[in-house]
Amino acid sequence: MALTITDANAKEIIASGKPVIIDFWATWCGPCMAMGPIVDDLAAEYEGRVVIGKYNVDEEGDLAAEHRIMSIPTFLFFKNGEKTAIRLAGSQSRETFKAKIEELLAL
């Protein structure tokens, strides 16, 4: 299961030393809801190696504004406390998402 990320805990999670992926989503977003099971499945598969978390843009807002999230779902990838060039937007296949996780781990 993916971790819940909020404005209050985001900086600490990003700075944790582990690679981090943040899923910016909302309950009314069909593609976001379709990605939910994939995100949760990959969070379990990569547990201990990558932190995968969900950030609800309707309940929070500062982190989304800081990273200029204009559409959802958007997935940002962080390593060593810094945002990487890896980014996914829109609905993605499990295989595509997993390939990006492997790319993050290889950085």
Predicted features and spans:
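Structural cue for short, hydrophobic secondary-structure segments
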Residues: 23-25, 77
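Thiol-based oxidoreductase modules, predominantly thioredoxin-like and allied folds used
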Residues: 5, 24, 36-43, 47-62
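The canonical Cys-X-X-Cys-His
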Residues: 29-32, 75
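Structural micro-motif
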Residues: 61, 67-76
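Short pre-active-site segment immediately N-terminal to redox-active cysteine/selenocysteine motifs
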Residues: 17-18, 25-28, 71
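Non-catalytic, surface beta->alpha helical segment in thiol-disulfide oxidoreductase systems
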Residues: 77-107
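A short beta-strand-turn-helix
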Residues: 3-19
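CheY-like receiver
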Residues: 12-13, 63-66, 100
